[in-house]
From Swiss-Prot:
Protein name, UniProt field: NADH-quinone oxidoreductase subunit H
A GO cellular-component term linked to this record: plasma membrane
GO BP, sorted A to Z: aerobic respiration
Species, as recorded: Saccharopolyspora erythraea (strain ATCC 11635 / DSM 40517 / JCM 4748 / NBRC 13426 / NCIMB 8594 / NRRL 2338)
PROSITE patterns: COMPLEX1_ND1_1 (PS00667), COMPLEX1_ND1_2 (PS00668)
Topology of this chain in the membrane: Multi-pass membrane protein
EC number annotated for this UniProt entry: 7.1.1.-
Length: 441
């Protein structure tokens, strides 16, 4: 076992409980802060102040909004599946909390005289646990859309499922190069492998793919198609209110914090101090509680990227979003992994330095990526004089374009007949005559 695993194995129960409560409190506070910071930054981008009333600088605005949601009426649609409808927000929020348990926040510290590592659990396959939790979280969204009994939530949940499937592949491929260079699936081992250099500089294309994938995984702008207001009203949480609606917001922002912390762990050296601070005093800033500060600063930098993208980029069309994942990220990631594999093989033979090959490979991949965006899409020629009929590529049911006949209009006699008093035949009245069967009057 590694040193981190040995430290965590000796943790008493009370220390484990303290870590669990601390992680939960940290994620909740980060959620409240992220919502406030996002609204303030977006406000500045749009030349308005943002929330500035509740508390100093508006810091208590998120807490006030949470309390407001807690006291709102909890409405359940008539057609909703009761238990699935209630459990869906919990299923969406729980995996995000679990995923953070394997992320190292710092090194070895002393807590009430007990030596431990600032990490809840150390697993040999910790990276796969994070990937699995990211996949499980979409179940809550799918169940929410299906159980609401409404078409808009169902469409939003299906979009989210397709989105996660598409970008989970690209995210997993971005992990492969990191695993090859770190030689382990352990998150603490990956952090230790970056003490001499960040993987973001060594594996720039993997870093870029992960950043794009993490935005798609969290359903954030410009990839917020599952909850597109202009198309789906509110998406998968259209029919939710009160605390269940707040749970979806909590899950979204906890996911943002988790993927940002994972990006810090995989590509920015984790809790290690950035250069040149890491060289001060022989690495004294990488000991004690200092690593928490570096980890928090890097995580906040990634959270700012989410806000920046939301404030600057418009929402993509659904076909553009799928094309980006399947036609660009996945194929280029496979080419990048092949290049990294060749580099590792040549490095073992001392033929060429890995840095030279990685720089050359990154340039080639960047050129290919730019070229794919510049090449126009091939369009199928369309005939102006033909109408698509049933049996074509997109079958259209035959339409009866004949104008319907006007309904018969009632005459004055019929109208008077309907108004005849009781006991009087239609057409009879004052001054009317009745014809006898023999023709006499």
């Amino acid at each position: 076992m590694t040193n981190t695993a040995e430290l965590l194995a000796d943790d008493p129960i009370w220390l484990v409980l303290i870590k669990v409560v601390a992680i939960f409190a940290f994620l909740v506070v980060m959620t409240l802060f992220s919502i406030w910071a996002e609204r303030r930054v977006i406000g500045r981008m749009q030349h308005r102040p943002g929330p500035n009333r509740a508390g100093p600088f508006g810091l208590l605005q998120s807490l006030a909004d949470g309390l407001k949601l807690a006291f709102k009426e909890d409405i359940r649609p008539v057609l909703a599946d009761k238990w699935v409808y209630f459990l869906a927000p919990v299923i969406s929020a729980t995996p995000a909390l679990v995923a953070f348990s394997v992320i190292p926040i710092g090194g070895e510290v002393s807590v009430f005289g007990q030596q431990t590592a600032l990490q809840l659990v150390e697993l040999p396959v910790g990276l796969l646990v994070v990937l699995a939790c990211a996949s499980i979280g979409v179940y809550g969204i799918v169940l929410a859309g299906w159980s609401s009994g409404s078409p808009y939530p169902l469409l939003g949940s299906l979009r989210s499922a397709a989105q996660v499937i598409s970008y989970e592949i690209a995210m997993g491929l971005s992990f492969v190069a990191v695993i090859m260079y770190a030689g382990t699936l352990s998150t603490s081992g990956i952090v230790e492998a970056q003490k001499d250099g960040w993987f973001a500089l060594l594996l720039p294309f993997s870093f870029l793919v992960y950043v794009v994938s993490m935005v798609g995984e969290t359903n954030r702008a410009p990839f917020d198609l599952p909850e597109a207001e202009s198309e789906l009203v509110g998406g998968f949480h259209t029919e939710y209110s009160s605390l269940k609606f707040a749970l979806f917001f909590l899950a979204e922002y906890i996911n943002m914090v988790t993927v940002s912390a994972l990006a810090t762990t995989l590509f920015l050296g984790g809790w290690h101090a950035p250069w040149p601070l890491s060289a001060i005093g022989g690495g004294v800033l990488n000991t004690g509680w200092w690593p928490v500060l570096w980890f928090l600063g890097k995580t906040l930098a990634f959270l700012f990227v989410f806000v920046w993208l939301r404030g600057t980029l418009p929402r993509l069309r659904y076909d553009q979003f799928m094309n980006l994942g399947w036609k660009f990220l996945v194929p280029l990631s496979l080419l990048w992994i092949i290049a990294v594999t060749v580099i590792r093989a040549l490095r073992n033979n001392d033929a060429v330095t890995s840095q030279q090959f990685l720089i050359a490979g990154g340039v080639v991949i960047a050129v290919l990526l730019v070229a794919t965006f510049l090449i126009p899409d091939r369009k199928v020629p369309e005939s102006d004089g033909e109408v698509p009929l049933a049996g074509s590529g997109y079958p259209i049911p035959p339409l009866d374009l004949e104008v319907p006949k006007a309904p018969p209009r009632r005459s004055a006699v019929h109208a008077g007949a309907q108004a005849a008093p009781a006991g009087q035949l239609p057409g009879e009245g004052a001054g009317s005559t009745k014809e006898e069967p023999n023709g006499s009057v």
